[in-house]
A protein has these predicted regions:
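Membrane metalloprotein/metal-transporter helix-bundle signature
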Residues: 1-170
Length: 170
């Protein structure tokens, strides 16, 4: 997800913050991966033609939404996985732009798609496990976790995402 995946990293961190236990965040990560794989594949095979002028600001707004949900919701809701899946569909369209800019020959789309998704998933798992070890393992069950860790970090992520959204719109 590096060097150009900072928006992706912030999205995954936002998912993690409200889900300091590994199982819920791994399910969200899986839903996100399945969703972005679908739209990435459809875009790579020209079934859909996403407009990056729309997709890129929506990606930034999706990061902001999840970060704000972290701030205003004291706990993970069951609907979160559906929201993450929907946002994954949008992120897949953004990934398609990045992958297609590499100029891949059409006979290697499937292999490239599979390898790209494996790489993205490994990157997501690395971000999740690192965040879990640095934050949740030590502080995730503390009474102050939401107030002093989730809210400030989510506010920072939301502010960055808002900046990106404005930048991508204008």
């Amino acid at each position: 997800i590096l060097p150009l995946g900072f928006d992706h990293i912030l999205f995954v961190l936002s998912l993690f913050l409200l889900s300091p236990k590994l199982k819920p965040v791994l399910w969200q990560s899986l839903a996100f991966t399945i969703a972005h794989s679908v739209t990435l594949g459809l875009a790579m095979y020209h079934v859909i033609k996403p407009t990056q002028k729309i997709v890129e600001p929506v990606i930034a707004l999706s990061i902001m939404y999840v970060a704000l949900e972290n701030i205003f919701s004291p706990r993970l809701r069951a609907s979160r996985i559906g929201v993450v899946f929907c946002f994954g569909l949008v992120h897949g369209m953004g990934f398609a732009s990045a992958l297609s800019s590499l100029g891949l020959p059409s006979n290697s789309y499937l292999t490239s798609l599979v390898m790209f998704n494996v790489g993205v998933e490994l990157g997501q798992l690395t971000v999740i496990l690192t965040a879990w070890f640095l934050l949740a393992k030590w502080f995730g069950n503390k009474p102050y976790y939401h107030k002093y860790i989730v809210i400030p970090l989510s506010a920072l992520i939301a502010a960055i995402a808002l900046y990106w959204a404005i930048q991508r719109i204008f």
